[in-house]
Amino acid sequence: MKWKGWDRVRLDPETGAVRFQGSPAPLVDAIAPIIVSASRSTDIPALYGDWFIERLKQGYVTWKSPFDGRIIPVSFVNTRVFVFWSKNPRPFIPSLANLTKDGRQSLFLFTLNDYTREDLEPGIPPLGERIRTFAEISSLIGRGRLTWRFDPLLVSDTVTIDDLLERIGSIGDQIARFTERLVISFIDIARYPRVQRNLAKCGLSGIREFSSEEIRLFASGLSQLNEEWGLEILACGEEIDLTGYGIAHGECISLDQIAREFSSDQ
């Protein structure tokens, strides 16, 4: 099915309510998506949970398009599912109940990496605490609605393929029973100057991209680990074909997953 774009509505910016032409209030055009990704640009569950719940009460939010910089109102009038991206959703746990009051549901893409020794992810809780949070989120929303995301996969002067597999194996052994799905992505440095600048700023010049042979070596090792876990593994945004290792091409946000998990929501 070809995507035909978002539904559009007219809303009152003071109240967030959808109105029809002829209303005395000044109206603005808004998109009204069924699925809202919140958000790849920042960690809303970790940092802006209270703000998000307040916007949910207001019924809309404004979004700055990364393509042309336009400010676009987004109405929640049609929204059925929120997809949250987070490295630390623990602060958001008390707010989860608010999402279901109006029949809305949630999926989580929980980025759970282990680059502790390299200090690549400052400001997040220790790995053990994040693993406990992963288990708690799973108990609240269900394992089918919680995706483990290991992103980015990288190698460096201190991180070898074997090191990476050992770290992933340790995490997977602890959380596989709390999820059904693992999404991976390999670091892409050459294509993104911003990534190059950030790595240089942190003094992390030894980090590099995988060679094709290293990708296959890693995929083989991950496939062996998954014999114990039984997870669906997808490579998000990758050109290389890893299906021979049981790693499918896929999207980070899976419409099949959404349809499966919310099949009763018509």
Would you name each region that the model predicts?
Residues 129-196, 221-237:
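Conserved C-terminal portion of the radical SAM core fold
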Residues 116-124, 152-162, 200-211:
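Surface-exposed cleft-lining segments at the edges of enzyme active sites
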Residues 123-124, 196-199, 247-254:
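Short, surface-exposed amphipathic charged segments that create phosphate/polyanion-binding patches used
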Residues 46, 117-118, 154-158, 190-193, ...:
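Short catalytic/ligand-binding loop motif for oxyanion handling, primarily in non-cytosolic enzymes
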Residues 41-43, 87, 111-115, 151-153, ...:
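Active-site beta-loop-alpha junctions enriched in small/polar residues
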Residues 2-11, 212-266:
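C-terminal accessory extensions appended to soluble enzyme cores
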Residues 184, 204-219:
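Substrate-binding surface in catalytic domains of secreted glycosidases
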Residues 1-120, 127, 132-143:
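Conserved Radical SAM active-site core
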